[in-house]
Amino acid sequence: GQAKLWRQKNSTVFAVLLIAITLNFIVTPTYAKNTELEGENYAPSSSSFQKPANVHTKNDTDTVGYFLGGGIQNSFNKESYPAFSGDQPLYTPYRSGFRFLGWYSDAALHKQIKTIPTDRKDHYILYAKWTAKINNYYNVEYYNYHKRESRFDKNLVLLKDLDYSFYNEIDIPGMPDTREEDVLKKYIFSASQCPQGICLTDEFVLITSYSTEDDCMGELMVFDRETGEYMVTLGMDENSHLGGIAFDGDNVWVCNSYENCVERISYDFIELMAYQNTGDVVDARDVVDEFPVKNTPSCITWYGGRLWIATHTLLVNSRMVAYYLDKKTDKLIALSDYKIPQKVQGVTFDDSGNVYLSTSYGRNQSSYLYCYDSVTALATRPKHPRKKVEMPPASEELDVSDNTLYILFESAGEKYYEGTDGKGKSLFPLDKILKIPIRELDVNGSSTSGT
């Protein structure tokens, strides 16, 4: 009798459990639906549920945490953004005595992030990367010059012993201090810039630069000469090194070593873009005329009605060829060929015919400025300049204007400053245009005036 009673009780319990389980499968989904629980909220904490794309509530947000590393936050950087509101830009914070190098998504500062994606609900932790600001005067004064060599070479002087200065009015886009903002403002096409060429006109300072990123246009950047204000960027051939730039009074000439040619751009066009498209980036690749040349165009200058185009070599003497523009055929005619020192990066003349060469190779090897009395003196004794100036590494092109020599450096470009190519970092970078009065060089014993 007890066994029968036990079986009846257990049958009753089993029936109740069966009814409860059945109701759980029927009632619970209905309850969830009626209370408008979304799948993400309804799923247990151990669930791997992922919300389908573009399915979200009006309260969904992407949250962001910032590690500023001693800096002060930019008020435009928010701690939350509405989900699915598009990529949100990141802005530059401030830290006294330091330059901001970007936001990173990992504490090791390897994975840079330039925008916050909001295509799904997420939480981001970002880390600010900093580096000490470049002190140009310090890097000139405390560079490790070859002092022993200067004692034995009476024609060699050190830059720190000259009355030099910097063109502080111009902030070159792509330099560490402004790199991130320059990209946001679209002054440049990428943050990976290598400044190459410089040319001065009455109205403007023109600077060329290439990007180390693939398929990214190079730049011809235009600045107001008096104020240093950035005016406009002209997009150039993405494959070109853009090693040099020159002005002949009517046109601007730019080196294109990739095509083994020089490109001509009307100065009127540059002037028009600078004043009517101020602050813009203009693709100028279709408005240039190409002129093939017989030597690889590494750098260029205009003097005496001729284009002087030099080729960079590493171990043997370089060469420089003078070209004449035949206006009837609109072709460049090679006239004279000259031997010049290796490692040439820039060439220019002053009004008296004195020649100045910028030579360099390597981010931690000295640059040298060579000064000659004439092109004949250069051609006959290329390794024996009248005066030689040792400078910090990575000098590029140079130009003469108003009794002053202007020299551009690439050592603060991302590839060298950050060592992104794996070949080390530049230890004494310069991010401003160097200025040396012609009288300091005293090539032929008298002050001269350049253009």
Regions found by a protein language model. Name each.
Residues K186-A191, L234-E238, V288-V293, S336-P341, ...:
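Surface loop/turn motifs at the tips and blade-to-blade linkers of beta-strand repeat domains
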Residues I134-K185, P429-T451:
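Sequence/structural signature of beta-propeller modules
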Residues T35-N135:
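Secondary-structure capping and domain/repeat boundary segments
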Residues A379-S401:
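Conserved blade-ending motifs and adjacent loop-strand segments that build the rim/top face
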Residues Y338-A377:
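Loop/turn-rich, solvent-exposed surfaces of beta-rich toroidal or solenoidal domains
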Residues D182-D215:
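Beta-strand-rich domains and repeat architectures in extracellular enzymes and scaffolds
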Residues S192-G197, N239-A246, P292-W302, P341-T348, ...:
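Repeated scaffold domains used in trafficking and secretory/extracellular systems
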Residues D215-L220, N260-D268, V316-Y324, N364-D373, ...:
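Structural motif
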